[in-house]
From Swiss-Prot:
One of its GO terms (biological process) is DNA replication. Residues 582-607 are annotated as: Disordered. The modification Phosphoserine is found at S81, S89. This is Replication protein E1. Residues 582-591 have a biased composition (Acidic residues). Residues 409-559 form the SF3 helicase domain. It is found in: Host nucleus. It comes from the Viruses. It holds the Pfam family PPV_E1_DBD. ATP-dependent DNA 3'-5' helicase required for initiation of viral DNA replication. It forms a complex with the viral E2 protein. The E1-E2 complex binds to the replication origin which contains binding sites for both proteins. During the initial step, a dimer of E1 interacts with a dimer of protein E2 leading to a complex that binds the viral origin of replication with high specificity. Then, a second dimer of E1 displaces the E2 dimer in an ATP-dependent manner to form the E1 tetramer. The gene is E1. It catalyses: Couples ATP hydrolysis with the unwinding of duplex DNA by translocating in the 3'-5' direction; ATP + H2O = ADP + phosphate + H(+). The lineage of its organism: Viruses, Monodnaviria, Shotokuvirae, Cossaviricota, Papovaviricetes. Keywords: ATP-binding, DNA replication, DNA-binding, Early protein, Helicase, Host nucleus, Hydrolase, Isomerase, Nucleotide-binding, Phosphoprotein.
Length: 607
C-alpha cells in the first residue's frame, strides 16, 4: 500500500492530458506571441498608418474646374460677346436671309446657355474684334492705382520729350482743333499781372479736376473749364490781378501737377474768333462754367461791336505802354508796338496812320520826359530801392567784399567812402579807382553803373559842347579810363562840379541848365593823387588802388562774379551801414504809392 502513492484511475488518462508536452519551439516568446495574435477576423481593423487618398481629391478638383469654367463662360458671354443675339441662343445666328457666309471660329466652351448642350457655339470671326476680345483687362486692379498709373504715364511721356512746350502745344491742338497761340497773347515776364488767364494742363487726375471747379470759385468771377484727350483747358477771370507765377502756384497746389505740365497765357481780348471760341464752348455739355461772361467776350460777340466805327489812334495809350515796358528808343518802340497790332486796336490804328514816324518820335520824347521827372523826384535811397526791385534772383554780397579785400583795401574805409559818395557829400562825391591794367577797375565800376542804371561819359566826345549832357539824366555817372588830357580838362573846367556846387551845363537844342553833378566814378591808370600837377584835385577826389590782377578760373570765367544779384544782396545787407533811408519813412503816412498813369482812360479797363 505504501508503494502506491497517489491515485490511479484506469482509463482516465486516455481522454485527459495530465501533463503538457514540452518542445523547443514553444520556448521562443516571439513565436508564442505571434501565434496568440492570430485569429480568423484579424484583417477586420487595419493598423497601417499610410492610407491612400484614392480618387476623392481628383474628384474635388474636377468639380472646382467645372464650376470655374462655368463662371468664366458666363463672364465671356456677358462682357465680350460680339452680339447680343448670342446671349439668347446661338441657333438664331445661323438663321440668315442672305447668302453671305462668314468664317466661323469656336470661341466658347461646350457648356452654353442651356438651350442645346449639343449645339456647337459659334461666333463671327472678325480679326480685329477677336484680337480685342482676347485682351481682357485684369479685374483685380483698383481704380485708384489705375488713376495713378495713368497720371504717371502722362507725366513720363511728357518728360521724354526734348521740347516740352512744343509737345504741349501739339497735344492741345490735337485735342481742341485750335492752336493755343490763337487763343492767347504772350507775356514775356512771369511777373506781369492780368485778371484773365488761359491755362492748359496735361494729365490731371480726374477727381482733382472735378474738385478744382468748386475750389476756384472763391478766387474767380468767371470760370470756363473743359477736358478732352487728357488735356484740360481753363479760362479763369480772377477777382484780383495775378501774375503767371501766382497762377501756376495756385494750380500746382490744387491739382498736384508739375509746372512743366502747364501752359498759361492771358487771352486775346480784341480777337473776335477767340471770343467766339469761349462763347460757343460754354454751350457744350462737357464744359463747366461759373459766373457771368466777362466784358471782353460780350463786346466781341455783340453785332453792334462788329458794325461800329473804326477805332482811332490814341497817343496816350502808346506812351503808357512804352513807359510801362521801359522803352525809350524810337526803334524799340516802333518794332515792339507793331508786333501788338494783331491783338491791340490802338496798335492797329497806329499802323494804319500816315504819321507813324512822328508818333514814334513824340512817344519816345514823352517817355524820356516822364522817366526823367520820375528820377528827379526820387531820392538816392528811393532810386536804389526802385532799381534793386527790378533785379530778379538772389546773389552773394560776400563776393564784392572778398574782391575789395583781395585788392588790399580796408573794407570799412571803402564803405565809409561809398556812403559819402552816394549821398553826394561836397568834395566826397567823386570816387577814383586807379591801378595797373587788367586789375578789374572797369568791371567793378561798370557792374555798379549797370545795376543802378547810371550813365557813362567818354572823353572822346570832349570836342563837343554836349559831351557832359548825360550827367543831367542820371543819378550816378562813370568816366572810364581817364588819361592825362582828361585830367588836365578836369583840373581846368570841372573843379566846381567836383565840389558839388551848381554848374551851368550846355545841352543840345536847349539853353544851358543849372545842375549839380551826380556822384561820379572815375577809373584811370594814373594816380592823380601822386601827381603834383593835379594838386588842386587832391582835395576833391577819394582814391583807392587796385594793384592785383583780376583772377580768372581755369575755364576763363572770373573768380569774383560781380553781377546785379551780388550788388542787390550787397545793398540790402549794408543798407543801414550806408545810411540809406527806410522807404516806409519816405511815403505819406505809410500809404503805398500809386502806379504812374499817363493815359486818358478809366482804371478798370484792360491794357
Amino acid at each position: 500500500m505504501a508503494d502506491n502513492k497517489g491515485s490511479e484511475t484506469d482509463g482516465l488518462h486516455e481522454w485527459c492530458l495530465l501533463e503538457a508536452d514540452c518542445s523547443d519551439i514553444e520556448n521562443d516568446l516571439d513565436t508564442l506571441l505571434e501565434q496568440n495574435s492570430d485569429s480568423d477576423v484579424s484583417d477586420l481593423i487595419s493598423n497601417d498608418g499610410d492610407l491612400e487618398q484614392g480618387n476623392s481629391r481628383e474628384l474635388f478638383q474636377q468639380q472646382e474646374l467645372e464650376e470655374s469654367n462655368a463662371l468664366l463662360q458666363s463672364l465671356k458671354r456677358k462682357y465680350i460677346s460680339p452680339k447680343a443675339v448670342l446671349q439668347l441662343s446661338p441657333q438664331l445666328e445661323s438663321i440668315s436671309l442672305s447668302s453671305d457666309h462668314k468664317t466661323k471660329r469656336k470661341l466658347f466652351a461646350e457648356q452654353d446657355s442651356g438651350v442645346e448642350l449639343t449645339l456647337t457655339n459659334e461666333t463671327e470671326d472678325v480679326t480685329t474684334l477677336v484680337q480685342q476680345e482676347e485682351e481682357v483687362p485684369a479685374l483685380e486692379t483698383s481704380s485708384t492705382s489705375n488713376l495713378r498709373k495713368e497720371d504717371n504715364a502722362h507725366y513720363k511721356e511728357l518728360m521724354r520729350c526734348s521740347n516740352l512746350k512744343a509737345t504741349l502745344l501739339s497735344k492741345f491742338k490735337n485735342a481742341f482743333g485750335v492752336s493755343f497761340v490763337e487763343l492767347t497773347r504772350q507775356f514775356r515776364s512771369n511777373k506781369t499781372c492780368c485778371n484773365d488767364w488761359v491755362v492748359a494742363i496735361y494729365g490731371v487726375n480726374y477727381d482733382l479736376f472735378e474738385s478744382s471747379k468748386q475750389l476756384l470759385q472763391q478766387h474767380c468771377d468767371y470760370i470756363w473749364v473743359t477736358e478732352m484727350s487728357a488735356m484740360f483747358l481753363y479760362l479763369l477771370c480772377f477777382k484780383a490781378g495775378k501774375n503767371r507765377q501766382t497762377v501756376i502756384r495756385l494750380l500746382v497746389s490744387m491739382l498736384y501737377v508739375a509746372e512743366e505740365q502747364i501752359l498759361s497765357e492771358p487771352p486775346k481780348l480784341r480777337s473776335t474768333v477767340s471770343a467766339l471760341f469761349w462763347y460757343k464752348g460754354s454751350s457744350n455739355a462737357a464744359t463747366f462754367t461759373h459766373g457771368s461772361y466777362p466784358k471782353w467776350i460780350i463786346e466781341q460777340t455783340l453785332i453792334g461791336h462788329q458794325t461800329g466805327e473804326a477805332a482811332t489812334f490814341d497817343m496816350s495809350t502808346m506812351v503808357q505802354w512804352a513807359f510801362d515796358n521801359d522803352l525809350t528808343e524810337e526803334a524799340d518802340i516802333a518794332f515792339q508796338y507793331a508786333k501788338l497790332a494783331p491783338d491791340d486796336v490802338n496798335a492797329t490804328a497806329w499802323l494804319a496812320h500816315n504819321n507813324q514816324a512822328r508818333f514814334v518820335r513824340e512817344c519816345a520824347n514823352m517817355v524820356r520826359y516822364y522817366k526823367k521827372g520820375q528820377m528827379r523826384e526820387m531820392s538816392m535811397s528811393a532810386w536804389i530801392h526802385f532799381k534793386l526791385e527790378q533785379v530778379e534772383g538772389e546773389g552773394q554780397w560776400s563776393t564784392i567784399v572778398k574782391f575789395i579785400r583781395y585788392q588790399g583795401i580796408n573794407f570799412i574805409s571803402f564803405l565809409s567812402a561809398l556812403k559819402d559818395f552816394l549821398h553826394g557829400k561836397p568834395k566826397k562825391n567823386c570816387l577814383l579807382i586807379y591801378g595797373p591794367p587788367n586789375t578789374g577797375k572797369s568791371a567793378f565800376t561798370m557792374s555798379l553803373i549797370k545795376v543802378l542804371h547810371g550813365r557813362v561819359i567818354s572823353f572822346v566826345n570832349s570836342k563837343s559842347h554836349f559831351w557832359l549832357q548825360p550827367m543831367s539824366e542820371a543819378k550816378i555817372a562813370l568816366l572810364d579810363d581817364a588819361t592825362d588830357p582828361c585830367w588836365i580838362y578836369m583840373d581846368t573846367y570841372l573843379r566846381n562840379g567836383l565840389d558839388g556846387h551848381l554848374v551851368s551845363l550846355d545841352c543840345k537844342h536847349k539853353a544851358p541848365i543849372q545842375i549839380r553833378f551826380p556822384p561820379l566814378l572815375i577809373t584811370s591808370n594814373i594816380n592823380a593823387m601822386a601827381e603834383p600837377n593835379y594838386r588842386y584835385l587832391h582835395s576833391r577826389l577819394v582814391a583807392f588802388e587796385f594793384p592785383n590782377p583780376f583772377p580768372m578760373k581755369d575755364d576763363d570765367t572770373p573768380e569774383f562774379e560781380l553781377t546785379d544779384q551780388s550788388w542787390k544782396s550787397f545793398f540790402k545787407r549794408l543798407w543801414r551801414q550806408l545810411d540809406l533811408s527806410d522807404q516806409e519813412d519816405e511815403g505819406e503816412d505809410g500809404e503805398p504809392e500809386k502806379a504812374f498813369r499817363c493815359v486818358a482812360r478809366s482804371t478798370n479797363e484792360h491794357l
